[in-house]
């Protein structure tokens, strides 16, 4: 083991550690980080070499964070990344510093966030908040307004999670939606992602995503926003229904085909009895 460690460079160790961290299941970053920390056995190397992995994980997962003094949580995403560990909160028109290890926000500062698209962003943000409140028991959203390649663009991000470590499962829903403000119509592009990890007496992960394309009539802010939210609601309902139906189908067919529900004898095995028989026999022979 020591010989192997000597032959692996620090750069390679960090690369492997970063890979583990970026693939940590939702809600299990700390557990994976602590395991990697023990394996690497070099805190300075881990913090300095894998810092990009911490940031990438939080942005990929749409990690929500509460900023002291403000009511609503904001999502950590690539769209709000200002560099130097600072992120944008468009709703409150501030930027803040984010600690990717502690998952804490600090140093809020005023920030110009809308790029001349304030009414569009606020209209979409208000409607999306209402939608998320209706459809997600623990959901958060952040809406950005940006000019990308000369086109005025609205980007809407949604995150919802349930972390149940005592019941051995964690899960997260993420969706991202974009459209450009280009009358008379614009293409809507969305990506929906579900990731669930179940680890009681086993290790099963569901990782699924779906790409969506649609179009929206671009008129005024209010009417366009209504159409935009309808597209989101329809696509997300359809995706959730499809996932549920596929799960049921897999339970009824695929999983049953993988193993017998009963052994060839057609009777269930009482492992506790077998264990007690074995122990009793060994005691008799002693």
UniProtKB/Swiss-Prot annotation:
Its main location: cytoplasm. Pfam families: F-actin_cap_A. The modification Phosphoserine is found at residue 9. The modification N6-acetyllysine is found at residues 19, 97. Keywords: Acetylation, Actin capping, Actin-binding, Cytoplasm, Cytoskeleton, Phosphoprotein. The modification N-acetylalanine is found at residue 2. GO terms for molecular function: actin binding. It is found in: Cytoplasm, Cytoskeleton. One of its GO terms (cellular component) is cytosol. InterPro entries: CapZ_alpha, CapZ_alpha/beta, CapZ_alpha/beta_2, CapZ_alpha_1, F-actin_cap_asu_CS. SUPFAM superfamilies: Subunits of heterodimeric actin filament capping protein Capz. It comes from the Eukaryota. Component of the F-actin capping complex, composed of a heterodimer of an alpha and a beta subunit. Subunit of dynactin, a multiprotein complex part of a tripartite complex with dynein and a adapter, such as BICDL1, BICD2 or HOOK3. The dynactin complex is built around ACTR1A/ACTB filament and consists of an actin-related filament composed of a shoulder domain, a pointed end and a barbed end. Its length is defined by its flexible shoulder domain. The soulder is composed of 2 DCTN1 subunits, 4 DCTN2 and 2 DCTN3. Belongs to the F-actin-capping protein alpha subunit family. F-actin-capping proteins bind in a Ca(2+)-independent manner to the fast growing ends of actin filaments (barbed end) thereby blocking the exchange of subunits at these ends. Unlike other capping proteins (such as gelsolin and severin), these proteins do not sever actin filaments. May play a role in the formation of epithelial cell junctions. Forms, with CAPZB, the barbed end of the fast growing ends of actin filaments in the dynactin complex and stabilizes dynactin structure. This is F-actin-capping protein subunit alpha-1. It comes from Mus musculus (Mouse). The lineage of its organism: Eukaryota, Metazoa, Chordata, Craniata, Vertebrata. The gene is Capza1.
